[in-house]
């Protein structure tokens, strides 16, 4: 987006985009590895007719979390710069400032909706839309957020179920292979969400560097 934004803000956004995309690529690789491993283990359980890997989901969930955390931090730094650039361009009607958009994923319950809305505004305003189109639907963001939320919900429920089964008097009886197939499905969704997000970061970063706002055009 060409306007009153300082070049240093655009350069910083590009640098942060590269870092965030690299960390997301590692997360994508980790989730794909988990998916493949879970599918193999599920196949073995289905063949044997027995549950062979009862405690595998929590271990894999921890592995995913360890790769998700640095990716989330890298994304937060990029989100901060992206929204700060919008403010520096003196755009009116922004609902999400840099601080609010950056903290949204880290606030319980709020992180179920606010990150998507903040990213949607960042996408639309970076692509030159006026404020009344700031929250219009974006297919890429819908795909990213749907994949991420469903994947995380399944992974969280699966991990909680296994831990409760292990450390309490409650027992969850599932057929062999069921938990691992659910793990593979959730990991696949998380991998897809990382792929969508890498592309979103690229599109928004390029838009801020090249797209001129309506206000700039008639200034």
Where are these regions (language model features)?
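Interfacial helix-start motif at the membrane-water boundary
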Residues: 54-70
């Amino acid at each position: 987006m060409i306007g009153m934004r300082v070049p240093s803000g655009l350069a910083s956004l590009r640098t942060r985009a590269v870092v965030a995309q690299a960390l997301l690529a590692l997360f994508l690789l980790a989730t794909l590895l988990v998916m493949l491993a879970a599918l193999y283990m599920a196949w073995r359980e289905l063949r044997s007719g027995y549950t062979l890997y009862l405690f595998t989901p929590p271990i894999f969930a921890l592995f995913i979390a360890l790769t998700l955390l640095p990716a989330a931090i890298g994304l937060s730094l990029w989100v901060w710069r992206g929204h700060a650039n919008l403010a520096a361009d003196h755009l009116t009607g922004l609902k999400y400032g840099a601080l609010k958009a950056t903290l949204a994923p880290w606030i319980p319950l709020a992180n179920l909706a606010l990150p998507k809305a903040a990213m949607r505004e960042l996408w639309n305003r970076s692509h030159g839309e006026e404020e009344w189109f700031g929250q219009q639907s974006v297919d890429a963001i819908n795909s990213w957020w749907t994949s991420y939320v469903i994947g995380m919900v399944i992974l969280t429920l699966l991990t909680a179920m296994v831990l409760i089964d292990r450390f309490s008097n409650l027992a969850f009886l599932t057929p062999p292979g069921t938990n691992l197939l659910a793990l593979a499905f959730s990991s696949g969704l998380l991998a897809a969400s990382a792929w969508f997000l890498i592309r979103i970061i690229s599109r928004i970063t390029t838009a801020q560097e090249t797209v001129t706002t309506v206000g700039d055009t008639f200034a």
